[in-house]
Amino acid sequence: MKHRSGRAWMRVAAAVALSASAACGDLATAPAPDGDRLAGVDVSHWQGAIDWNRAAGDGVSFAFIKATEGGDYVDPAFAANWAGAAAAGIPRGAYHFYRPQTDAAAQAQHFLRTVQLRAGDLPPVLDVEVTDGRPAAEIAAGVRTWLQTVERATGRRPIVYTRASFWTGQMGGGFGAYPLWVAHYGAAQPSIPADWSRWAFWQHSDAGRVAGITGDVDLNWFAGSWADLQAFIQTGAFSHAP
């Protein structure tokens, strides 16, 4: 995901054709070729104050919310967004922006101190998209430390957010057991890093428009139905093939 922005997904009941408005990321017209996907948003303080009830009414079925970055940064809007999404009945997840220059275990503890997960929340997310000038092997080792630390502490297997072009050049293998949230804009289907055979979430636009959110917001798909999403939240199991 872009360092400045959040992520979004919306629920669409049936497949629709790609149009000019869809290309711009309108929520109601974003293409869902198989009609069996959920749409949602992911956000940070860059989206400003959000009317989560309006967003829910516009079809937001889940939201990823920026919580932390590095070893000490907390997104200024995290608390408001975390509470607002829950109050509007939107399944929520928190993400950490990984900084390879900072100790991975310290980053994991910072996230765990900041985010209190409860029943009905999405799994934690690690956003992996920058190198900070660190070597690939060091980045991969640190990412593994963060994922394992957070999974042990929460009992939830984290989601990995990345894009294929970054992951392929930096990370190597051995991460395919973690659910994938992949970023790829302007494509009928996203490119997927070699570690994975399918995606759970797909960020397909960074220029979406959603009621209750001022300006652009990232749009995302979940590769399944509402029942699939609830099963994923409850068990961590993901069996729907996009």
Cite the ranges covered by each PLM segment.
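Bacterial N-terminal signal peptides that target proteins for export
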Residues: 2-13
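N-terminal Sec signal peptide cleavage junction
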Residues: 23-24
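Functionally critical loop-and-helix segments that line ligand-binding/catalytic clefts
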Residues: 30-44, 48, 53, 175-242
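Substrate-binding cleft of extracellular glycoside hydrolase catalytic domains
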Residues: 36-53, 65-156
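Sec/Tat-exported extracytoplasmic proteins
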Residues: 59, 67, 86-89, 115-119, ...
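Structural detector of well-ordered beta-strand residues that form the stable sheet scaffold
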Residues: 93-95, 125, 159-161, 181, ...
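Glycine-rich, charge-decorated loop segments at or immediately adjacent to ligand/cofactor-binding or catalytic sites
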Residues: 103-104, 166-176
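Aromatic-lined carbohydrate-recognition surfaces of secreted/lumenal glycan-active proteins
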Residues: 155-168
